[in-house]
UniProtKB/Swiss-Prot annotation:
One Pfam match: Peptidase_C101
Keyword terms: Cytoplasm, Endoplasmic reticulum, Membrane, Nucleus
Domain OTU: 125-353
Protein name, UniProt field: Inactive ubiquitin thioesterase OTULINL
Taxonomic source organism: Mus musculus (Mouse)
BP GO annotations: protein linear deubiquitination
Segments of this protein annotated with the region Required for membrane binding: 1-80
Membrane topology according to the record: Peripheral membrane protein
UniProt entry tagged with the keyword Cell inner membrane: no
Superkingdom of this protein's organism: Eukaryota
Main location: cytoplasm
Function: Lacks deubiquitinase activity.
Domain comment, as recorded: The N-terminal region that precedes the OTU domain mediates interaction with cellular membranes.
Amino acid sequence: MEAPRSAPRERERARTTSGSDQVHSWILVTSQVLSAAWRIARAFVMTTLSPLSATFSYFRSLYLYLGHQLKWWIGYLQRKFKRNLSVEAEVDLLSYCAREWKGEAPRARLMRKAYEELFWRHHIKCVRAVKRDNYDALRSVLFQIFSQGLSFPSWMKEKDIVKLPEKLLFSQGCNWIQQYSFGPEKYTGSNVFGKLRKCVELLKLQWTEFSGMRDHHKRGSMCNSLFSDAILECKLYEALKFLMLYQVTEAYEQMKTNKVIPSLFRLLFSRESSPDPLSFMMNHLNSIGDTCGLDQIDMFILGYSLQVKIKVFRLFKFNSRDFAVCYPEEPLREWPEISLLTENGHHYHIPVF
């Protein structure tokens, strides 16, 4: 009686087990199919994206390279074609002061007061910053001579200054001039006379051109062009140095014959470092443009040689009698006046009234 009742249970259990196995098989098959499909899809995506990724990486590298090259060429062209003016354009005096002298340090306060003095009492409204080097005093003076169209000094009208180097050698026996040094170039040798002659010839040519030009704006434009050429500038400054040496030599020859000479030359020859023209050249003049600029006695000689009254506002001497000084102190004639300003006695800028 028990056997017939148990047979249906067994059949039911068998059907249940069979259904479970089928479900498990379907799940397994589905999982395998999905896994295979995922592998195929991933392989397809990787196969598709790899070239795209490589292409993107290539163009990104190319973009960075071209950007770097473009930046380099822009900088190169700017450096090549930008005028490197050694005398900058006019800027408002008080704005320049505010930019350069900030803070409450004692020196900054002194400079601000000195600039205010220039603005209100001396009616200086603008300033032209001058390149800082050991030629800046000569540059500041010559720029104003050219920009104002000043004429030749009287003594330069009477003599051909281009022939002065040979005159010193052959007429006055100054063979020591072969030791003349051209600023940082430090050139000495048998061709000194040829180099000096070219420098003086350039100065005469440029001075003649500027002094004969009546158009103020045209003079200004030509000044900007000339004072952006470092090679021509150096030649002009060496010509000025030579004219100073010539005047010192002339005064020395006059002193030897007991003639009256300006007091500034007596002061020059009384110094241990410059008792004669050779010592002056070796100990002072040759260093100008190289290791030092002009000192006070050099400024006197420069003003005398060019027949201009050089008025210097020395801002570091504010509130003293030496705030404004002139070189020479007492011009022999009514020479034209040009002005400089200095914050430390070494570097000069151009005030604009």
